[in-house]
Every structure is written in C-alpha cells, then in structure tokens.
C-alpha cells in the first residue's frame, strides 16, 4: 500500500511538470506597492495582493502563471493599462528588443521595499514564465 501511495505521488508530480509550459522572455520590470491610506490593496478582480504577486498583460501571460525572477517567484494575478500598453518598455527601451519587451509590474508591501528592489536590479531582465497547459488541464 505504501508503495502504491509513493507511485501515485510520483505520477502526480510528473503530471504537474508535464502540464506546465515554460518560456523565457525579455521584460521591463516595474514596481508598485500598497499606497498608505488607500484602505485595501486589491488586484483588478478583488484578489488581495501580496509580495508574491505581479501584474501582467493577460493576452501575453495567462493569469495564474508563475513568473520567475532571479531572486523570487511571483504569480500573475493583476493587470493595468500601463502594463498592457507596455508604456515603460516603449519609454525606456534603447534597443529594439527592449522596446518590444513585455512589461511586468511586481508588487511590494511598501514603497521603501519596492524602490530598494528597483534600484538594485536592472530595468530589463530575462524572466522565466511557467504557464499551465490549457489543453492538458481542460481534458
């Protein structure tokens, strides 16, 4: 019985690995934070934001995807017009690849944390995006 449980657990882990698509993308990383006095810090859909969350363009990265930065992993739960319009990439990109980059807005609990992270990391970086495989998940 114990062997069966271990085998089933191993198969589930393998299935999870097979059901995820992984891609790398050049991204312009911006930061945002909980604004003092605003009461709540919720995503566009009401999800309470925490430091493991980020905003993305849902046409390029599906909600629920994991975005892997060099120092952390975030879940795509939020969006915004500047992310969708890629304003930061178009404004700050010096090379064509930078101007074509996606924009990911990483959430932090405070302004100090957000600005400290932004000052110590490059504006453009390659991130890994792990998206669930819709076809396998929708069987």
Q: Model-derived features: where do they sit?
A:
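N-terminal hydrophobic targeting signals that begin at the initiator methionine
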Residues: 1-2
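Bacterial N-terminal signal peptides
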Residues: 6-15
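Solvent-exposed, well-ordered loop and adjacent helix/strand elements within mature globular domains
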Residues: 19-139
